[in-house]
């Protein structure tokens, strides 16, 4: 039996968590889910609970398509904003592992500026 690999892109900001599954090339979208599709309140979109439920749904979707092994790319907002992933990133990865999906590599895909725009000045 040939094993089919996929790539799970987890975009975790402090406002939302988006889980997006593509094929290994990244060209074709297989499944996509966001925190807002799971919870009612806007304040809960980035919560670990929303990320966990989304990851379980994604695991079911990709299993139907025949993907059993994945690489994970975690991305924070980055740029001149926060370089740390939001609260949903860790929960989503843990939920995927618990759902029985084999995880290959976990890598950080946060964009880092090479002297881009000036960051916001702090309050006095």
Curated annotation (Swiss-Prot):
Gene Ontology MF terms: rRNA binding; structural constituent of ribosome
Pfam families for this protein: Ribosomal_S11
UniProt-listed SUPFAM superfamilies: Translational machinery components
GO biological process: translation
Function field: Located on the platform of the 30S subunit.
Quaternary structure, from the entry: Part of the 30S ribosomal subunit.
This protein's name: Small ribosomal subunit protein uS11
Organism from which the protein derives: Methanococcus aeolicus (strain ATCC BAA-1280 / DSM 17508 / OCM 812 / Nankai-3)
Originating gene: rps11
């Amino acid at each position: 039996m040939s094993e089919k690999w996929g790539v799970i892109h987890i975009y975790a900001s402090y406002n939302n968590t988006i889980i997006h599954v593509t094929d290994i090339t990244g060209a074709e979208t297989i499944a996509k889910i966001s925190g807002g599709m799971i919870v009612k309140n806007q304040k809960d979109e980035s919560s670990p609970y929303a990320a966990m439920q989304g990851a379980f749904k994604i695991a079911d979707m990709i299993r139907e398509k025949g993907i059993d092994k994945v690489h994970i790319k975690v991305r924070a907002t980055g740029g001149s904003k926060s370089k740390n992933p939001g609260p949903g990133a860790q929960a989503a990865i843990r939920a995927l592992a618990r759902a029985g999906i084999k995880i290959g590599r976990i890598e950080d895909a946060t964009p880092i500026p090479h002297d881009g725009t000036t960051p916001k000045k702090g309050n006095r």
